[in-house]
């Protein structure tokens, strides 16, 4: 019995299985019928059939799915809390006030770079990309939509800013996990990341500034501002009091309050504002918390901004994450990851090829596991001996883990991060993917440094020998 449980797929079987999964997900996305969710669900059926055909214990394999899903339960709860917060913020007039002030104060040409900077600062200070996207990101999306700026561009600026802070903040979970996996010091890890992150951030800021001036040329009039503001004033009581939920969540995040608790308390505050300021009933507030807000405004642009939110709107994203992460856990149990990763590692013959291999492994593990922690652990576990053999400092490995595993999330439509960004910002993955400049420039710089030797620190020979003797 134990022999049956330990049986795994070989390399050809693993590649065939991955091809089936990719095709099923791609077909569902292409046909626009259920998105990746049905394709990912089908992958569970494929796994069951493969287990039966090749005599592998399905009970043992599916246990890997449940173990993997347990790791992302906080993310699932966070998604639903975000849905509640968006709905209650809309009902309380918080979003309407932000839109009104933004239209009056922000020059549309500068919205994209300002969005990038705002989300970057908030994410660095709070240490959470989820929190900055759910608060500042939602607000900037609303302003951008009202200004007629391409929603994919605004979402791209939000995500790049949030991921920049998440990657560099000493309070971020990924910033602490990567050096822990690579056995590097936190300070060395952050200093090493500056080499790949700061140049790409400057380039990203320049690109969003250029896009901002191109997007708003001749497409924004004073008349449209008046129409939008009058419509918002007609439906909501606007003012500082409606900003209490937004101010509260920023304060709570700065005080290191758990993200889910901060979102929940902000939603409660929004409910009180809705009841006492907007004069909504308790039944209306509870209904909005689940079903989302529906505006009476007839202006199409404002309808697209205000008609959203609610816990129910996030359930499809919860399902995608469950199926995707569960699939990743089963693939690890089947040995699919090990076969593919080992095939990549065998081709390493220089520091440059080692960095390139680490990037590829990081993206492959992210693509399959759909989880940042799992991608860091799997990649670090596989590549650490290779880095030690070539006497490359551990902070270079931890930097590579972040340059690939952390940055890959929003670039994968079924990854937990990709699903979260699309669901929270209300923008399709295909719309914001072309504007994730920071995310796909960072690994390019990392690989360039690997082949040129720039910033690649090697361990002293004596130190390496001493560590070997101790072992």
Q: Could you describe each region identified by the protein language model?
A:
Residues 50-59, 144-151, 170-172, 273-285, ...:
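Juxtamembrane membrane-interface segments at transmembrane alpha-helix termini
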Residues 55-145, 298-385:
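Membrane-embedded alpha-helical segments and adjacent helix-loop junctions characteristic
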Residues 1-77, 195-205, 209, 213-320, ...:
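Hydrophobic transmembrane alpha-helices of multi-pass small-molecule transporters
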Residues 22-26, 48, 117-121, 142-143, ...:
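Alpha-helical transmembrane segments of multipass membrane proteins
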Residues 39, 43-47, 51, 74, ...:
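Alpha-helical transmembrane segments in multi-pass membrane proteins
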Residues 107-199, 361-403, 468:
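Hydrophobic transmembrane alpha-helices that form the pore/transport pathway of multi-pass ion
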Residues 31, 167-170, 178-230, 389, ...:
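Juxtamembrane and boundary regions of transmembrane helices in multi-pass small-molecule transporters
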Residues 4-13, 100-107, 123-129, 229-238, ...:
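Short, amphipathic, aromatic/basic-enriched membrane-interface segments that mark the entry/exit
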């Amino acid at each position: 019995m134990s022999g049956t449980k330990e049986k795994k797929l070989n390399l050809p079987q693993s590649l065939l299985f991955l091809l089936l999964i990719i095709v099923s997900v791609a077909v569902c996305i292409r046909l626009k019928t259920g998105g990746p969710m049905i394709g990912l669900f089908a992958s569970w059926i494929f796994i069951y059939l493969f287990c039966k055909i090749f005599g592998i214990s399905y009970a043992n394999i599916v246990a890997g799915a449940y173990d993997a899903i347990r790791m992302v339960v906080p993310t699932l709860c966070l998604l639903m809390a975000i849905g509640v917060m968006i709905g209650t913020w809309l009902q309380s007039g918080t979003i309407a006030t932000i839109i009104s002030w933004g239209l009056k104060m922000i020059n549309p040409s500068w919205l994209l770079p300002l969005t990038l900077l705002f989300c970057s600062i908030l994410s660095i200070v709070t240490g959470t990309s989820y929190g900055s996207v759910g608060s500042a990101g939602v607000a900037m999306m609303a302003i951008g939509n009202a200004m007629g700026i391409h929603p994919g561009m605004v979402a791209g600026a939000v995500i790049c800013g949030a991921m920049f802070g998440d990657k560099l903040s000493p309070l971020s979970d990924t910033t602490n996990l990567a050096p822990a996996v690579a056995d590097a010091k936190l300070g060395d890890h952050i200093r090493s990341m500056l080499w790949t992150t700061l140049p790409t951030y400057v380039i990203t800021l320049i690109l969003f500034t250029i896009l901002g001036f191109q997007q708003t040329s001749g497409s924004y009039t004073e008349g449209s501002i008046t129409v939008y503001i009058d419509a918002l004033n007609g439906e909501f009581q606007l003012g500082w009091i409606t900003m209490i939920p937004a101010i509260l969540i920023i304060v709570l995040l700065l005080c290191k309050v758990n993200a889910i608790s901060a979102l929940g308390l902000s939603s409660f505050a929004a409910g009180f504002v809705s009841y006492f300021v907007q004069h909504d009933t308790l039944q209306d507030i509870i209904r909005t918390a689940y079903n989302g807000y529906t505006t009476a405004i007839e202006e199409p642009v404002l309808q697209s901004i205000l008609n959203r939110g609610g816990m129910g709107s996030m359930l499809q994203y919860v399902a995608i994450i469950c199926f995707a992460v569960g699939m990743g856990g089963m693939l690890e149990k089947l040995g699919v990851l090990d076969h593919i990763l080992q095939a990549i590692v065998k081709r390493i013959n220089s520091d440059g090829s080692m960095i390139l291999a680490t990037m590829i492994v990081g993206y492959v593990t992210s693509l399959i596991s759909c989880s940042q922690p799992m991608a860091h652990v799997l990649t670090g576990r596989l590549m650490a001996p290779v880095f030690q053999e070539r006497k490359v400092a551990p902070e270079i490995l931890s930097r590579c883990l972040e340059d690939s595993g952390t940055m890959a999330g929003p670039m994968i439509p079924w990854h937990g991060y990709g699903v979260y960004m699309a669901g929270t910002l209300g923008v399709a993955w295909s719309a914001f993917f072309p504007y994730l400049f920071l995310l796909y420039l960072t690994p390019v710089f990392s690989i360039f440094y690997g082949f040129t030797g720039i910033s690649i620190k090697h361990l002293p020979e004596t130190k390496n020998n001493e560590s070997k003797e101790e072992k």
